[in-house]
Amino acid sequence: MSKYQTHLKQLEAESIQIMREVAAEFDNPVMLYSVGKDSSVLLHLARKAFYPGKIPFPLMHVDTNWKFKEMIDFRDKMAKKHGFDLIVHKNPRGMEMGVGPFTHGSAKHTDIMKTEGLKQALDMHGFDAAFGGARRDEEKSRAKERVYSFRDSKHRWDPKNQRPELWNIYNGKVDKGESIRVFPLSNWTELDIWQYIYLEGIEIPSLYLAAERPVVERDGTLIMVDDERMPIEEGEKVENKMVRFRTLGCYPLTGAVESQAQTLPEIIQEMLLCTTSERQGRVIDNDSAGSMEKKKMEGYF
């Protein structure tokens, strides 16, 4: 076994230990399933952690109504294939208002449909711990967040008041109404994720692989035209380009990258030469300075 495989096995063991710890320690945990590559790895790890039994907590998808069509199809296929309990939540107030990224802007859309939608769902089901697939290498505010990220009764995160974590000892004490966000993939990198997906044969949406797709260049970002709701502005032209996505979210807010990587080994090779964060394609991260940290302090994942 190579050193890198051993490294991945160590990361796998750490993540599985965290999942088992949460399942034993908390009354009502849930796993946030956003259908991306990190969520796919989390699902795979959860199935391993509790094999041959069933995953002892539900998976939940906060649906903004603007996800890529393929993501929704993939989500439903995985739920049927693996038989896990799936909760899908859409913010009813946002749906009634017709909130969307084009009509209300990216910041308001994200706040109402993602942040408020997530808080609604957590309160509705009384979850006291929620797994997420965030990693420290993704973004600077996530780099300083603990594996067990304490949230108050309003789901807010205080980056100046985080609990110490010594080695693999986690403090899960919460009072009524408080909760913990748990990040088992904290110490993984994007390259680790892709190598693990390849070695374990984990199924992922084909949006991660390069293919000819209809895109519009807007403010320097390639936006895929995923359905008829995408407005084409004056002077814009829809072109078919070989693109793939390094991260997945609401399609109008997720930029594609030009790429020829059509297989997992080609993606891994591309990652070895890449010097930019995968979240460079997330429009919401550029709403304002410190945008992600502000969102997390308001309750965003």
From Swiss-Prot:
Pathway: Sulfur metabolism; hydrogen sulfide biosynthesis; sulfite from sulfate: step 1/3. Its EC number is 2.7.7.4. The keyword Protein biosynthesis does not apply. Keywords: ATP-binding, Nucleotide-binding, Nucleotidyltransferase, Transferase. It comes from the Bacteria. GO terms for biological process: hydrogen sulfide biosynthetic process; sulfate assimilation. CDD domains: Sulfate_adenylyltransferase_2. InterPro entries: PAPS_reduct_dom, Rossmann-like_a/b/a_fold, SO4_adenylTrfase_ssu, Sulfate_adenylyltrnsfr_sub2. It catalyses: sulfate + ATP + H(+) = adenosine 5'-phosphosulfate + diphosphate. The keyword Nucleus does not apply. GO terms for molecular function: ATP binding; sulfate adenylyltransferase (ATP) activity. With CysN forms the ATP sulfurylase (ATPS) that catalyzes the adenylation of sulfate producing adenosine 5'-phosphosulfate (APS) and diphosphate, the first enzymatic step in sulfur assimilation pathway. APS synthesis involves the formation of a high-energy phosphoric-sulfuric acid anhydride bond driven by GTP hydrolysis by CysN coupled to ATP hydrolysis by CysD. Belongs to the PAPS reductase family. CysD subfamily. Heterodimer composed of CysD, the smaller subunit, and CysN. This is Sulfate adenylyltransferase subunit 2 2. The gene is cysD2.
